[in-house]
Amino acid sequence: MSENTDSTHEKLIFAPSRYQYEKSSLHRDALMGKDPLVLFNQWFQEATDDEGIKSPESTTLSTARLPSGRVSSRLVLLKELDHRGFIIFTNLGTSKKAKDLKSNPYASLSFWWEPLQRQVRVEGIIERLSREETEEYFKTRPRNSRIGAWASPQSEVIADREELEKRVEEYKKKFGEDESVPVPVPDFWGGIRIVPLEIEFWQGGKYRLHDRFSFRRNTLDEDYELVRLAP
C-alpha cells in the first residue's frame, strides 16, 4: 500500500486535553429566584478581583448577516451593565458588526474567565443607545481615543498605516489639542445594548461534566426560566 502524502489531511494542531476543571460547582438551589443580570455582576466582580484575570471586561461579540447567515466574531470590551443588558460602544457606520446588525438584530456575547474556570454566554437583541447616553460615555474617553473614533473608517480597506496616521493628524488639527475644547461624538459612532433572551452560566467540572445553567425567555416581556443543560 502506498503512503498517503496528501498534505490536506496533515494535522497542523493536535491538542489532546489534559487540563482538568476542579475549581468549583454550581447548584440549582443557589440560582433559583435570582436575577441573571445581578448574578452576572457578582461573577464579574469576582473576575475583577482575581489577579490572574487582566481584562475581565473582554468578551467575544458574534453577529450574523442575513440572508447569507455568515457569522463574524471579534473581541470587544464590555463598558456598562444596566438593568436591561450589556453595553458596548463602536463604529455604527462602516464596521462589519454594524452591517450585520442592520440585517439581523440578534447577537451573542461570550465571556471566558480561565482562572475561575467560568464562562458566561449571552444571546439577545440589539438596541441602540440614545445620543445622550453615548455622549456621556464618549466624554470619558482619552482625547486621542475620541479623535481616533473620527479617524478610523473601521473595517474599510486602507492602503497602509501611514494613511491611518495621516487621518489622525488631520483630525488633531481640526479639533486641536486643547482639552477644554470638546471633541464631538461622530454621527456614525455610538453605543449598543444587548438585551438578553438567554444568559448561560458555565462552571467547569471534573471529567468535563461541567455545570451549565441557563436563564432563558422567548420574548423580552417574559420572565426568565431557569434550566440545567447537559455539558
Curated annotation (Swiss-Prot):
Its cofactor is FMN. The keyword Oxidoreductase applies. It catalyses: pyridoxamine 5'-phosphate + O2 + H2O = pyridoxal 5'-phosphate + H2O2 + NH4(+); pyridoxine 5'-phosphate + O2 = pyridoxal 5'-phosphate + H2O2. One of its GO terms (molecular function) is FMN binding. InterPro entries: Pyridox_Oxase, Pyridox_Oxase_CS, Pyridox_Oxase_N, Pyridoxamine_oxidase_dimer_C, Split_barrel_FMN-bd. It is an enzyme of class 1 (oxidoreductase). Pyridoxal 5'-phosphate binds at residues 20-23, 79, 137, 141, 145, 208-210. Gene3D superfamilies: Electron Transport, Fmn-binding Protein, Chain A. Its EC number is 1.4.3.5. Coiled coil: none annotated. Keywords: Flavoprotein, FMN, Oxidoreductase, Pyridoxine biosynthesis. Catalyzes the oxidation of either pyridoxine 5'-phosphate (PNP) or pyridoxamine 5'-phosphate (PMP) into pyridoxal 5'-phosphate (PLP). This is Probable pyridoxamine 5'-phosphate oxidase.
